[in-house]
Amino acid sequence: MFKKSIITHAPIHWLSDEEREEVAENTLSWLLELGSMTRRFEQHCHQVTVMPYQEGFIEYIEPADEQKCLPYSRRYWLREIVLCGDNVPWLLGRTLVPEETLTGEDRQLVNLRTVPLGRYLFQETTLSRDFIHIGQQNGHWLRRSRFQLSDKPLLLTEVFLPASPVYKQ
């Protein structure tokens, strides 16, 4: 049985292109980071660690707006974690992977445990990103990206917690 999602069910306000223009440049550089967020965090601390919250297969996706970002699958791999810089929680991460993506080498995604997702994804030459949506939830910045790994999709939502360097100007 799964716990309630680490990312609350509070409404997310996704920013329009016009609203993006109002975001501070430093904040926007974090939200639109194209490389590994893990590597970016490592520039601001001595050690980045993962605290797993929950992981396993699910048969349906909530909230529904995530479902619209992925093709239908009978099951999805769900992984929710807290990413810490020097043992301080900086980011909540939620990864959804259609079962069809978990083939060949990419089956390793179900065994990451305390390894940051970025360490796996950004070593792959077959990785591309379809989009980055940015928004706010309960006063926290967040972003959602759909990646293609060997032309197979996965969805990553990241919520930046108050102690995160994204809020430092």
From Swiss-Prot:
One of its GO terms (biological process) is ubiquinone biosynthetic process. Its EC number is 4.1.3.40. Gene3D superfamilies: Chorismate lyase-like. Substrate binds at M37, R79, L117, E158. Its main location: cytoplasm. It comes from the Bacteria. InterPro entries: Chorismate--pyruvate_lyase, Chorismate_lyase_/UTRA_dom_sf. Keywords: Cytoplasm, Lyase, Pyruvate, Ubiquinone biosynthesis. GO terms for cellular component: cytosol. One of its GO terms (molecular function) is chorismate lyase activity. It is found in: Cytoplasm. Belongs to the UbiC family. Monomer. Removes the pyruvyl group from chorismate, with concomitant aromatization of the ring, to provide 4-hydroxybenzoate (4HB) for the ubiquinone pathway. This is Chorismate pyruvate-lyase. It comes from Proteus mirabilis (strain HI4320). The lineage of its organism: Bacteria, Pseudomonadati, Pseudomonadota, Gammaproteobacteria, Enterobacterales. The gene is ubiC.
